[in-house]
Curated annotation (Swiss-Prot):
GO terms for cellular component: mitochondrion. (6S)-NADPHX binds at residues 62-66, 131-137, 160. Its EC number is 5.1.99.6. It comes from Aedes aegypti (Yellowfever mosquito). This is NAD(P)H-hydrate epimerase.
């Protein structure tokens, strides 16, 4: 299985939109749904000791959109989701995703949670702040939440890229989030090779075979009707 560099990841995304005519809405819904399924598989069983209250941290881009979708589906899977979404856009897609969450009783807040509150309140954190187009360093406005994620002992599930990591080189000195689980979307990125003792899943069951062949992805087979593959 191939691990994509940043240029390849961006090119694959562009081809999905331009060559294969997927819409952003389609891919975001499929990606976020697969993330929710992974989280339920990992932490939702009756045997799990993880508290079913989840803090979903959403950034301003498509990675954050995946998080908003995941929060909605987690609510339907009987998780108690709370969304931290500080920097919002005027795009209809994101306005609608936020509205859908709020209409289902999910709190969507701009206020950065404190470390003490997170550790006392939540059993899981979903990190959907930055995606594969991110380039370090982290902007100052996101420094407080990154500090919470770096210090928290609550298990973190990162969506596609652990936030603050370089897409190819991995963790940076100032941002060294160590997720309990990484959900790679479409195909793993090079930074995933830097994971230590983390569960690793692949989600986003929408890549056309011709596109897989063009980039020599050699993706694993999704079994049955599963929306994810467990890689490690």
């Amino acid at each position: 299985m191939k691990y994509l560099n940043q240029h390849e990841a961006i090119s694959v995304d562009e081809e999905l939109f331009n060559e294969y005519k997927f819409s952003v809405d389609q891919l975001m819904e499929l990606a976020g749904l697969s993330c929710a399924h992974v989280i339920n598989d990992c932490y939702g069983s009756p045997q799990s000791t993880v508290k079913r209250k989840v803090l979903v941290c959403c950034g301003p881009g498509n990675n954050g959109g995946d998080g908003l979708v995941a929060a909605r589906h987690l609510k339907l899977m009987n998780f108690d989701a709370h969304v931290y979404y500080p920097k919002r856009t005027e795009k209809d897609l994101f306005i609608n995703l936020q509205h859908q969450c709020e209409s289902m009783g999910i709190t969507v807040s701009k206020d950065c949670p404190t470390l003490e509150w997170v550790e006392g309140e939540f059993g899981l954190i979903v990190d959907a702040l930055f995606g594969f187009s991110f380039k370090p360093p982290v902007r100052e406005s996101f420094a407080p939440i990154m500090d919470v994620l770096n210090k928290s002992k609550v298990p973190i599930v990162s969506v596609d890229i652990p936030s603050g990591w370089h897409v190819e080189e991995g963790p940076q000195d100032e941002c060294n989030i160590q997720p309990d689980c990484l959900i790679s979307l479409t195909a793993p990125k090079l930074c995933a090779k830097k994971l230590t003792n983390a569960k690793h899943y692949l989600g986003g069951r929408f890549v056309p075979p011709k596109l897989q062949d063009k980039y020599a992805m050699e993706l694993p087979t999704y079994e049955g009707n599963n929306l994810f593959v467990k890689l490690s």
